Amino acid sequence: MAAATGDPGLSKLQFAPFSSALDVGFWHELTQKKLNEYRLDEAPKDIKGYYYNGDSAGLPARLTLEFSAFDMSAPTPARCCPAIGTLYNTNTLESFKTADKKLLLEQAANEIWESIKSGTALENPVLLNKFLLLTFADLKKYHFYYWFCYPALCLPESLPLIQGPVGLDQRFSLKQIEALECAYDNLCQTEGVTALPYFLIKYDENMVLVSLLKHYSDFFQGQRTKITIGVYDPCNLAQYPGWPLRNFLVLAAHRWSSSFQSVEVVCFRDRTMQGARDVAHSIIFEVKLPEMAFSPDCPKAVGWEKNQKGGMGPRMVNLSECMDPKRLAESSVDLNLKLMCWRLVPTLDLDKVVSVKCLLLGAGTLGCNVARTLMGWGVRHITFVDNAKISYSNPVRQPLYEFEDCLGGGKPKALAAADRLQKIFPGVNARGFNMSIPMPGHPVNFSSVTLEQARRDVEQLEQLIESHDVVFLLMDTRESRWLPAVIAASKRKLVINAALGFDTFVVMRHGLKKPKQQGAGDLCPNHPVASADLLGSSLFANIPGYKLGCYFCNDVVAPGDSTRDRTLDQQCTVSRPGLAVIAGALAVELMVSVLQHPEGGYAIASSSDDRMNEPPTSLGLVPHQIRGFLSRFDNVLPVSLAFDKCTACSSKVLDQYEREGFNFLAKVFNSSHSFLEDLTGLTLLHQETQAAEIWDMSDDETI
């Protein structure tokens, strides 16, 4: 209990200090602000709290901060008074401990003192109830350290009590109390608020009048000895006023001590119990106003809150157990990502990455590693497609599966992978589809049943690709990548392809076709005046995204059944165990780099020659391909143009697919590779090549 030193002959006036009350929502909002907005900024921030004068007996005078404390325009709860504060959030616990508390208190006290001297506190009495909040948020452990300060100016002289505090019902009649309630409510309604921190009172036996502080000269005109003021009082103690009275008495002494000898104070407490309003427990007392000589210097101030042990020190709250585990997981998942934006990559657009919807075709070694890396980047929407079941050889290389998943013939990979992602992080939207992808050279016309099943599989795949933003091709065979490559090219979806050899790998992005409504000569969205065309496209530099090749563009034969007449080591993907981890990680990093480029999938491809140049994005280069050689621990970044006779992305194939749909696809599935080669012109190319070789041989023989 804080006290003002009193005259030896009179009682001392004591005040009940505020007790801080911080809602869990405040700490959650501070966490979000720290991660997303404040980062390393330690500059003071404006915040807002409130206090209430209607609490039940026994509760302390609380200053409450909720999740809305950071929104200065947020409405104050009904029948509560606002309190304006300043937040000092430090970056380290050491900074929190060594912060100059005395200086912070003096700065806040000076602001209050200036508002008293200038008269702005009369216009806006909320300025008398400022507070400070010094914090440090340990976002790894969810430990929050804080120290409140409620600056209170100290008068140079004592504030002797002329009449000690008594209940309002001992000084006012029932009629006067009802008149006070009515007058207060009318004033609040006139001002458009539900509570007033301070107000003037004038009363006699028959009436009670109230007014705003700024009208004191007219309101008290003719009074010479005593004035009466009302204070919205959050304290419940019968003998002591709350903290908001302290700075008001300094204002009264500074401005009115030459005109009035004393101030009668009504500590207005407005409680509703069992549906009945009651203000009779308010207290009223009279204090003598000391003469306060004019001084430009701010009076001494106090106000730092004591901790739970009653000593001068900060408090700490541990929210790691009481916060919602799913919200904790979500915040923790994003923690490292958002820390990148603080200092290392301040221009990183995480929203583009987190919101992207990824379709993973293949839930094997590559699919598992890609999924884990996507989760590391905060991607929330991941869908698996696979038709295989988990075998005993899988769990050691495929990190989403365990030994139990192999029992009973094995769980479907796609469903098990999606289920495991949700167990790892409940906030992810993971789905699995146990389905086959029809392939060239793998006939589906054995019966009407197989043909209809293939039709359903194609329709399902088309719907999945349409509903996702990025498609990852992570299957075992080359021909299984053909159908999704065609569909994705037709739907203008970004495709990231990863394939493994024994000690080599390729990771690439497919060229992104121009939007269908644009002609061949039109520019791509956001593409700066066909920059690649102006610079001159070559095989090595300045190739824009719409001219890049796909996985099949370097082939001169159509994909077929690659598993026929193959031994076991040729049918299985036999590669060095670390290769899938490397390729899977690079596939995701390539996607993220593409998303960070302002032109997205239309970005000009970076090559090995660009490694010493200024990178096009905050994360670095945006290559077309990454080809790795683990035997040499080396990577190269080749770039290749789209092939006009490509069996997957050429205009002839896409036009045929868009016109005929499944009928065209069924021909590809049921025919040999010559069908696609005839369609695209590869057959003619082979014939021309053979003819050229014959002519070369003839010339040699002649010579």
Curated annotation (Swiss-Prot):
Keywords: Acetylation, Autophagy, Biological rhythms, Cytoplasm, Disease variant, Isopeptide bond, Neurodegeneration, Phosphoprotein, Protein transport, Transport, Ubl conjugation, Ubl conjugation pathway. Its main location: cytoplasm. The keyword Cytoplasm applies. CDD domains: Apg7 (cd01486). Widely expressed, especially in kidney, liver, lymph nodes and bone marrow. Changing G511D: In SCAR31; results in severely decreased LC3-I lipidation to form LC3-II. Changing C572A: Loss of LC3-I lipidation to form LC3-II. One of its GO terms (molecular function) is Atg8 activating enzyme activity. Changing R246D: Almost completely impairs ATG3 binding. Severely reduces GABARAP-ATG3 thioester bond formation. Severely reduces GABARAP lipidation. The keyword Membrane does not apply. InterPro entries: Atg7, Atg7_N, Atg7_N_1, Atg7_N_2, ThiF/MoeB/HesA, ThiF_NAD_FAD-bd, Ubiquitin-activating_enz. The active site is at C572. It is found in: Cytoplasm; Preautophagosomal structure. Acetylated by EP300. GO terms for cellular component: axoneme; cytoplasm; cytosol; extracellular region; ficolin-1-rich granule lumen; phagophore assembly site; secretory granule lumen. E1-like activating enzyme involved in the 2 ubiquitin-like systems required for cytoplasm to vacuole transport (Cvt) and autophagy. Activates ATG12 for its conjugation with ATG5 as well as the ATG8 family proteins for their conjugation with phosphatidylethanolamine. Both systems are needed for the ATG8 association to Cvt vesicles and autophagosomes membranes. Required for autophagic death induced by caspase-8 inhibition. Facilitates LC3-I lipidation with phosphatidylethanolamine to form LC3-II which is found on autophagosomal membranes. It is linked to Spinocerebellar ataxia, autosomal recessive, 31: A form of spinocerebellar ataxia, a clinically and genetically heterogeneous group of cerebellar disorders due to degeneration of the cerebellum with variable involvement of the brainstem and spinal cord. SCAR30 is characterized by global developmental delay, hypotonia, variably impaired intellectual and language development, ataxic gait, tremor, and dysarthria. Most affected individuals have optic atrophy. Belongs to the ATG7 family. Homodimer. Interacts with ATG3; this interaction is essential for the transfer of ATG8-like proteins's thioester from ATG7 to ATG3 and plays a role in the conjugation of ATG12 to ATG5. Interacts with ATG12. Forms intermediate conjugates with GABARAPL1. Forms intermediate conjugates with ATG8-like proteins such as GABARAP, GABARAPL2 or MAP1LC3A. Interacts with EP300 acetyltransferase. Interacts with FOXO1. The C-terminal part of the protein is essential for the dimerization and interaction with ATG3 and ATG12. The N-terminal FAP motif (residues 15 to 17) is essential for the formation of the ATG89-PE and ATG5-ATG12 conjugates. This is Ubiquitin-like modifier-activating enzyme ATG7. It comes from Homo sapiens (Human).
